């Protein structure tokens, strides 16, 4: 359905904001501005099999389940095979955009959920990241049983992106 799809131009705008943040001096908070960490993100032009994408950065996949989607189930269930929607996580950052099901008995709305990033426990462990035991040092598509990704609620993608890019709200 078209209302569930994010346009190529909107994705390019989102990634432009993200890249400006990572190039430094763009996003200012009470603890300082963003720093240039020499990373630039690009929308994939080809899928992991080498096929050209009609919309850069997007593979539209028909969902066989019910809408809206239970984000907790999608992100954490290792029995339903949702890892099949991933591209190799060592080559791509997997971001899934779909309408989230409301949480039972709650007026709260989840805007986004992420497993990223991880760090390995030990000497080089990075504060603020989810730490994994070193036996999990090979996070690859072939050994994942759950959807190792970030998910954004498509009903709120503009709000979520604007929140991280310091845009104002009315």
Regions found by a protein language model. Name each.
Residues 20-169:
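Metzincin-family zinc-dependent endopeptidase catalytic domain
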Residues 1-17, 21-22:
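Primarily auto-inhibitory N-terminal propeptides
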């Amino acid at each position: 359905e078209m209302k569930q799809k994010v346009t190529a131009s909107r994705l390019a705008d989102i990634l432009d904001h993200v890249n400006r943040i990572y190039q430094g001096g763009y996003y200012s908070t009470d603890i300082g501005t963003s720093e240039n960490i020499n990373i630039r993100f690009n929308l994939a032009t080809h899928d992991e099999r080498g096929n050209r994408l009609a919309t850069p950065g997007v593979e539209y996949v028909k969902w066989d389940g019910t809408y809206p989607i239970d984000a907790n189930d999608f992100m954490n269930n290792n029995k339903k095979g949702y890892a099949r929607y991933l591209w190799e996580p060592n080559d791509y950052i997997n971001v899934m955009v779909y309408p989230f099901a409301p949480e039972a008995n709650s007026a709260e709305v989840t805007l986004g959920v992420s497993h990223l990033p991880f760090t390995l426990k030990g000497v080089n462990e990075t504060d603020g990241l989810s730490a994994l035991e070193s036996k999990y040092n090979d996070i690859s598509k072939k050994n994942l049983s759950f959807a190792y990704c970030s998910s954004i609620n498509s009903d709120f993608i503009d709000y979520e992106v604007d929140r991280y890019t310091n845009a104002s709200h009315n």
